[in-house]
């Protein structure tokens, strides 16, 4: 079976690099175009990335000799789908241009997330939200990831919401520096320090999960009906977002019921046996000092959400710690899993 031709937009950035790594020898998709800024256009990817590749494995052989172009659908006419790791300053218009040209977009940027016709897709959590794509007027459809911080949080909340109902959630994030992209946070700001503010993060963390965890009725996504309060902090960890979560339930569960709901959780990616689908989706660790980025980040090749430290909360009901890989499960990996789901469900033609 021939593979679907795809492009990577923002190919030189941190998320773009993850796309290129994860798409190497992919059974469904063939990367035929790499797109970046005018500064890189006209050069081969290997030439541009000689000193800029920041992933421990080597640049995949398929990518080295591809000539970079600017992100213009006229230059990538043969592709069916584009993965976007573009900066939000340019992503909105560029992604819309691709959709207008009939090329599907799976975006990691914030620009289209709150459009009522665009799903914030988390493949195990809300595959039913794909129904709203028919409301988009363009031939090419736009699908987005959530913010990387709340990806693991949303996965942790989904089975709890379904079984016990949720009234309110408090989040306290400790976000890795790779989440700021490259070159990222200045060394003098982050070494030996915690920065208690990340522009726009708290607003996204308080609203995106409600859309992601909502239900589709009459072709529209109805947001979940609980409240979220978030504190977001940048910490001197390279990869991995750790979030402390406290939850007030409509029907308070026991510790055993919560753990059981996490261990039993799976979704369409697991049922369909998608290449990047983690098994388990959630791993609960009993050790009192886990999860830790250094020890747990690569669980399930970076796609498994790791949870620990479940204990009673004296103000709400229960509290726990959730860890997810921000550039894999929270970005490129989630987007690729979404694309695999679209492929298997024949949304890509």
From Swiss-Prot:
Entry's EC annotation: 1.2.1.11
Main EC class the enzyme belongs to: oxidoreductase
Residue ranges crossing the lipid bilayer per the database entry: none
An annotated GO BP: lysine biosynthetic process via diaminopimelate
Catalytic activity from the UniProt record: L-aspartate 4-semialdehyde + phosphate + NADP(+) = 4-phospho-L-aspartate + NADPH + H(+)
Ligand binding (phosphate): 113, 204
InterPro entries: ASADH-related (IPR051823), Asp-semialdehyde_DH_CS (IPR000319), Asp_semi-ald_DH_pep-lack (IPR005676), Asp_semialdehyde_DH (IPR012080), NAD(P)-bd_dom_sf (IPR036291), Semialdehyde_DH_NAD-bd (IPR000534), Semialdhyde_DH_dimer_dom (IPR012280)
GO molecular function terms attached to this record: aspartate-semialdehyde dehydrogenase activity; NAD binding; NADP binding; protein dimerization activity
Keyword terms: Amino-acid biosynthesis, Diaminopimelate biosynthesis, Lysine biosynthesis, Methionine biosynthesis, NADP, Oxidoreductase, Threonine biosynthesis
Recorded metabolic or biological pathway in which this protein acts: Amino-acid biosynthesis; L-lysine biosynthesis via DAP pathway; (S)-tetrahydrodipicolinate from L-aspartate: step 2/4; Amino-acid biosynthesis; L-methionine biosynthesis via de novo pathway; L-homoserine from L-aspartate: step 2/3; Amino-acid biosynthesis; L-threonine biosynthesis; L-threonine from L-aspartate: step 2/5
Positions of NADP(+) binding: 12-15, 39-40, 178-179, 326-327
Binding site for substrate: 175, 201, 234
Active-site residues per Swiss-Prot or TrEMBL entry: 148, 241
Function, in words: Catalyzes the NADPH-dependent formation of L-aspartate-semialdehyde (L-ASA) by the reductive dephosphorylation of L-aspartyl-4-phosphate.
Subunit description: Homodimer.
UniProt record similarity statement: Belongs to the aspartate-semialdehyde dehydrogenase family.
The protein's name in its UniProt record: Aspartate-semialdehyde dehydrogenase
Annotated source species: Leptospira interrogans serogroup Icterohaemorrhagiae serovar Lai (strain 56601)
Primary gene name: asd
């Amino acid at each position: 079976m021939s593979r679907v031709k795809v492009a990577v937009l923002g190919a030189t950035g941190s998320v773009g690099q993850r796309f290129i790594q994860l798409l190497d020898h992919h059974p469904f998709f063939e990367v035929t175009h790499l797109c970046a800024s005018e500064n890189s256009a006209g050069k081969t990817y290997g030439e541009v990335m000689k000193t800029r590749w920041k992933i421990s494995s080597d640049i995949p052989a398929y990518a080295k000799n591809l000539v970079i172009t600017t992100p213009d659908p006229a230059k990538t006419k043969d592709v069916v789908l584009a993965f976007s790791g573009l900066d939000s300053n340019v992503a909105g218009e560029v992604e819309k241009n691709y959709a207008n040209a009939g090329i599907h977009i799976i975006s990691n940027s914030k620009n289209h997330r709150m459009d009522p016709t665009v799903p914030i897709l988390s493949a195990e959590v809300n595959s039913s939200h794909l129904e709203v794509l028919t409301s988009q007027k363009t031939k090419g459809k736009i699908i987005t990831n959530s913010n990387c911080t709340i990806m693991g949080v949303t996965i942790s909340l989904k089975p709890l919401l379904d079984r016990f109902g949720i009234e309110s959630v408090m989040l306290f994030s400790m976000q890795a520096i790779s989440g700021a992209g490259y070159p990222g946070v200045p060394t003098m700001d982050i070494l030996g320090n915690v920065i208690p503010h990340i522009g726009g993060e708290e607003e996204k963390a308080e609203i995106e999960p409600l859309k992601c965890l909502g239900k589709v009725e009459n072709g529209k996504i109805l947001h979940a009906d609980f409240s979220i309060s978030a504190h977001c902090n940048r910490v001197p960890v390279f990869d991995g977002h750790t979030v402390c979560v406290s939850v007030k339930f409509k029907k308070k569960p026991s510790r055993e019921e919560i753990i059981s709901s996490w261990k039993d959780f799976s979704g369409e990616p697991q049922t369909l046996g998608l290449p990047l689908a983690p098994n388990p989706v959630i791993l609960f660790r009993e050790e009192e000092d886990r999860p830790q980025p250094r020890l747990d980040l690569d669980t399930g090749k970076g796609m498994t959400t790791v949870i620990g430290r479940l204990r009673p909360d004296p103000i709400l009901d229960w509290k726990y710690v959730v860890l997810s890989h921000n550039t894999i499960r929270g970005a490129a990996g989630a987007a690729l899993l979404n694309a695999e789901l679209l492929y298997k469900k024949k949304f890509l033609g």
